[in-house]
UniProtKB/Swiss-Prot annotation:
Homo and heterodimers. Residues 1-40 are annotated as: Disordered. InterPro entries: ARF_dom, ARF_plant, B3_DNA-bd, DNA-bd_pseudobarrel_sf. Disruption phenotype: Double mutations in this protein and in ARF4 protein significantly suppresses the adaxial development defect of leaves of the AS2 and RH10 proteins double mutant at high temperatures. It holds the Pfam family ARF_AD. It comes from Arabidopsis thaliana (Mouse-ear cress). GO terms for molecular function: chromatin DNA binding; DNA binding; DNA-binding transcription factor activity; molecular function activator activity; small molecule binding; transcription cis-regulatory region binding. GO terms for cellular component: nucleus. This is Auxin response factor 3. The keyword Electron transport does not apply. Keywords: Auxin signaling pathway, Developmental protein, DNA-binding, Nucleus, Transcription, Transcription regulation. Expressed in the whole plant.
C-alpha cells in the first residue's frame, strides 16, 4: 500500500523510497453512483486516495470517452483484433459489428509506466436490434452526449507540458508557463522577495508528491525545484514525455504522466494489458457473442488511433451517410499540449479494409489524405464516425499536393516543333499556348522594330497589332506585368533593301511590317527597345532615353549588341554580294535561336 512520500527526504534517501512501490488503482461501476458519472472510485491506499476519473481521462487524452453503464454501444471485433498479438491468425467468423449493452467499467493504471486502460463488460443484444433501432421501435435513450462518463463542462483547470532536456536534467527544475501556474497552482505571495510555496499533488495510484514552487530568475518565471528530480527519476521520464497537472473542483492538485510513445499513438501494450487480452481471448469472445452471454475486454485508448467501442447514436448517424471521393472533412485530433483541434483532409477512396474476412465492414473503410501530412501521425484510413464532412466536393486538382516552390511547368524540355524560315523558331508562341499562369518577373518581351517608311504612326500600328494578337492567342489568366509577347520573324521586303524574302506567315501575320529584334535584347515592357524611324542612322534607342542595352537588376542581359549591329549593317548589293549577305544573316539567325533558350533559362533562374 502506498503511503505519503516526502520527496525532500527522497533526494537524500532514494534507496528507502524505492521500497515504497505504488500500487495499481482501479475503479469499478457502482450501482449507487450518481447519474452524472457511472464510474466511481474505490480507495486503494491508506492515504485515502484513489483513481481520479478526471485524471484518468486527462492521461488518456481528449479524444477518449468512457461509456456509461447501461448505454447502447457498438463493439467492432475487427478493431479489437488489430491490437491482439495473434491478429494475423485470428479468424473467428464474427460479424463486422455487434450491438451491446455496457454492464461494467473498471479503470486501471499500469504500475511502472502509468499507462491507463479500462476493463469493460458487455452484453450482446439480439440480432434484430439494429433493425428495431432503425425503424424506431427501440429508442436509443440519451444520445451521443450521454455516452461519456465525464462531462466536457466539468473539465478541471489543467495544463500539459512536453518535457525538454532542461526539465529532465538532474541539476535543473521544471519550468511552468506563467498562465498555467496561475490557473492550476495556489496563488503565491508576490510581496515576498522570493515568492515560494510547497505543492502537494496526487498521481493515478494515489501517491502524494511534494514539490517546491518558486518564482525567481531573470526574467522571473515559475519553477518546480525541490522534489522534481526525484519524481523524474522515479517515473523514468525522458525528454519528449509529457507531465500534466490539474486542479479539480475540490481544489486538490493531481499529477499525471503521458509517455512520448502514447502521445504519438504508437504505445506498446503493457505486459498487464497483454495478459488481460490473452485471458479474454477471442475464441471466448466469439462464443459469448454467439450465445448472447457477457464478455469482458481490455480497452486501451492509446493502442490505436481508432476506438472499437463507440456509442450507437454516433454509428447510426453516419452509417447511411453518402460519403464520396473528393469530399472534404475535418477530424478531431490531439495536439502536443493535450488539447483538441480539428484537422482537415479529403476522402481519396472508399473500400473495405479486409474484404475477405470482414466484407461490408465500416471499420476504417475510408481512405483519406490529410492537408497536414505530418500532424500527429495521421492514419491513411479512418472510420466514418471519426470525421465530420465539411464543405463541398473538391475537384481533381485538390488531390495534387502543391510544393513550396513553383515548378517549371509550361516550358518544354526540348526545342519546339514550329519551323520558321532562316532557322528561327517561334519558341514563345508554342510556350505561351500552354503557359496559363505567368508570375511577375518571368515575362519575356522581345521588342518590335518597325522599318516602315510611313513614320511613327506606322510603328505604333504595328506594335498595337502585335499586342492584340498575343492577347487573343490564349492568355486566359495573365495579370499586369506577366505577359509573354513572342518575337515575330517577319521582314518587310522593300525594294530599297535589295532582299527578296518570301513571307512565311499567313492570315493576320501578313499585316505586320516589322523586323525582328535580336532575341538577346528582351526584358520587361519598361525596357523594350524601339527603332526610331526618324533617326538618320536608324539606330536602336532605349524607350526611356537610356542606352541601347537591356538590363535586369542592374546586370546586362546581352553582350551581342556589337555583333547584332554588324550583322544587320550588311550592305545590300546585286549579285554575289546579295548571297553573301543572306549567308551572314542566316548564321546570325541561327545564333539568335540558340540565344533564345540561354536567355530564357537565365531569366527563369533569376526569377526563381
Amino acid at each position: 500500500m502506498g503511503g505519503l512520500i516526502d520527496l525532500n527526504v527522497m533526494e537524500t534517501e532514494e534507496d528507502e523510497t524505492q521500497t515504497q512501490t505504488p500500487s495499481s488503482a482501479s475503479g469499478s461501476v457502482s450501482p449507487t453512483s450518481s447519474s452524472s458519472a457511472s464510474v466511481s472510485v474505490v480507495s486503494s491506499n491508506s492515504a485515502g486516495g484513489g483513481v481520479c476519473l478526471e485524471l484518468w481521462h486527462a492521461c488518456a487524452g481528449p479524444l477518449i470517452s468512457l461509456p456509461k453503464r447501461g448505454s447502447l454501444v457498438l463493439y467492432f471485433p475487427q478493431g479489437h483484433l488489430e491490437q491482439a498479438p495473434d491478429f494475423s491468425a485470428a479468424i473467428y467468423g464474427l460479424p463486422p459489428h455487434v450491438f451491446c449493452r455496457i454492464l461494467d467499467v473498471k479503470l486501471h493504471a499500469e504500475t511502472t509506466t502509468d499507462e491507463v486502460y479500462a476493463q469493460v463488460s458487455l452484453l450482446p443484444e439480439s440480432e434484430d436490434i439494429e433493425r428495431k433501432v432503425r425503424e424506431g421501435i427501440i429508442d436509443v435513450d440519451g444520445g451521443e452526449e450521454d455516452y461519456e462518463v465525464l462531462k466536457r463542462s466539468n473539465t478541471p483547470h489543467m495544463f500539459c507540458k512536453t518535457l525538454t532536456a532542461s526539465d529532465t536534467s538532474t541539476h535543473g527544475g521544471f519550468s511552468v508557463p506563467r498562465r498555467a501556474a496561475e490557473d492550476c497552482f495556489p496563488p503565491l505571495d508576490y510581496s515576498q522577495p522570493r515568492p515560494s510555496q510547497e505543492l502537494l499533488a496526487r498521481d493515478l495510484h494515489g501517491l502524494e508528491w511534494r514539490f517546491r514552487h518558486i518564482y525567481r530568475g531573470q526574467p522571473r518565471r515559475h519553477l518546480l525545484t525541490t522534489g522534481w528530480s526525484a519524481f523524474v527519476n522515479k517515473k523514468k521520464l525522458v525528454s519528449g514525455d509529457a507531465v500534466l497537472f490539474l486542479r479539480g473542483d475540490d481544489g486538490k492538485l493531481r499529477l499525471g504522466v503521458r509517455r512520448a510513445s502514447q502521445i504519438e499513438g504508437t504505445a506498446a501494450l503493457s505486459a498487464q494489458y497483454n495478459q488481460n487480452m490473452n485471458h479474454n481471448n477471442f475464441s471466448e469472445v466469439a462464443h459469448a457473442i454467439s450465445t448472447h452471454s457477457v464478455f469482458s475486454i481490455s480497452y486501451n485508448p492509446k493502442a490505436s488511433w481508432s476506438n472499437f467501442i463507440i456509442p450507437a447514436p454516433k454509428f447510426l448517424k453516419v452509417v447511411d451517410y453518402p460519403f464520396c471521393i473528393g469530399m472534404r472533412f475535418k477530424a478531431r485530433v490531439e495536439s502536443e499540449d493535450a488539447s483538441e483541434r480539428r484537422s482537415p483532409g479529403i476522402i481519396s477512396g472508399i473500400s473495405d479494409l479486409d474484404p475477405i474476412r470482414w466484407p461490408g465492414s465500416k471499420w476504417r473503410c475510408l481512405l483519406v489524405r490529410w492537408d497536414d501530412i505530418v500532424a500527429n501521425g495521421h492514419q491513411q484510413r479512418v472510420s466514418p464516425w471519426e470525421i465530420e464532412p465539411s464543405g463541398s466536393i473538391s475537384n481533381s486538382g485538390s488531390f495534387v499536393t502543391t510544393g513550396p516552390k513553383r515548378s517549371r511547368i509550361g516550358f518544354s524540355s526540348g526545342k519546339p516543333d514550329i519551323p520558321v524560315s532562316e532557322g528561327i523558331r517561334a519558341t514563345d508562341f508554342e510556350e505561351s499556348l500552354r503557359f496559363q499562369r505567368v508570375l511577375q518577373g518571368q515575362e519575356i518581351f522581345p521588342g518590335f522594330i518597325n522599318t516602315c517608311s510611313d513614320g511613327g504612326a506606322g510603328a505604333r500600328r504595328g506594335r498595337f497589332k502585335g499586342t492584340e494578337f498575343g492577347d487573343s492567342y490564349g492568355f486566359h489568366k495573365v495579370l499586369q506585368g506577366q505577359e509573354t509577347v513572342p518575337a515575330y520573324s517577319i521582314t518587310d521586303h522593300r525594294q530599297q533593301h535589295g532582299l527578296s524574302q518570301r513571307n512565311i506567315w499567313c492570315g493576320p501575320f501578313q499585316n505586320f511590317s516589322t523586323r525582328i529584334l535580336p532575341p538577346s535584347v528582351s526584358s520587361s515592357p519598361s525596357s523594350v527597345l524601339l527603332t526610331n524611324s526618324n533617326s538618320p542612322n536608324g539606330r536602336l534607342e532605349d524607350h526611356h532615353g537610356g542606352s541601347g542595352r537591356c538590363r535586369l537588376f542592374g546586370f546586362p542581359l546581352t553582350d551581342e549588341t556589337t555583333a547584332v549591329a554588324s550583322a544587320t549593317a550588311v550592305p545590300c548589293v546585286e549579285g554575289n554580294s546579295m548571297k553573301g549577305a543572306s549567308a551572314v544573316q542566316s548564321n546570325h539567325h541561327h545564333s539568335q535561336g540558340r540565344d533564345i533558350y540561354a536567355m530564357r533559362d537565365m531569366l527563369l533562374d533569376i526569377a526563381l
